[in-house]
Amino acid sequence: MQCCNQQSSQPKTTTTCPGGVSSCYKKTWRDHRGTIIERGCGCPRVKPGIRLICCKTDECNN
């Protein structure tokens, strides 16, 4: 599984997820800096107020 792992509006980068990981995530939230985007492997739990998208194809979280 290949997932994007760049932060916010940085140039696209990808990572190969460890064995057994079959999903990618994209978390989005706002703070004093503006909209923050975090991407990576897996599908983590998030706090209320954080938007989470999980998907199951290569680089689907761009």
Swiss-Prot record:
Tissue localization of expression: Expressed by the venom gland.
Pfam families with a match to the protein in the record: Toxin_cobra-type
InterPro entries (alphabetical): Snake_3FTx, Snake_toxin-like_sf, Snake_toxin_con_site, Toxin_cobra-type
Keyword Metal-binding in annotation: no
Disulfide-bonded cysteines: 3-24, 17-41, 43-54, 55-60
Function statement: Binds to muscle nicotinic acetylcholine receptor (nAChR) and inhibit acetylcholine from binding to the receptor, thereby impairing neuromuscular transmission.
Identification of the protein by name: Short neurotoxin 1
